[in-house]
């Protein structure tokens, strides 16, 4: 889009320059959904949660779920505050929208096996551990619900062929989904390209 005149161009340049001086970063587009979310715990809050970890049931995350935790922590998945509940999940799978109507193309889910959900209760908290067993986040468990993996594969990936890595991962995961907000205790360790990971 062409700016109408030199005055408008100078005003726009001045706005960007002042923003860079004040924040040391370029202004970006507004976050999806209009609100930037951060789920990373403040150090004091993190220490309180870490003291409770030995007394809270836990679930071990897959590599994909660990990546999702990072995106939830830094706001890359804004406006999501955690893993999808049933209404949002079903809406995303059927219509590529959250239940609110906001466009969202892929379900952000946390799967669990029947054995894992036996010790879990909605309204309670669950420690989410990385594949090495270290506490990564706390799930504030709001829902436990069943889902159809084959239906999700066909709807999201347009195939149920396990040669597709997304389908293979989906069909291998647990038969229950856990929904709820997360409090992220730390970002995942061993992340590649850390110098390029610029958070929103």
Question: How should these model regions be labeled?
Answer:
Residues 1-200:
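Non-catalytic terminal extensions that flank enzyme cores
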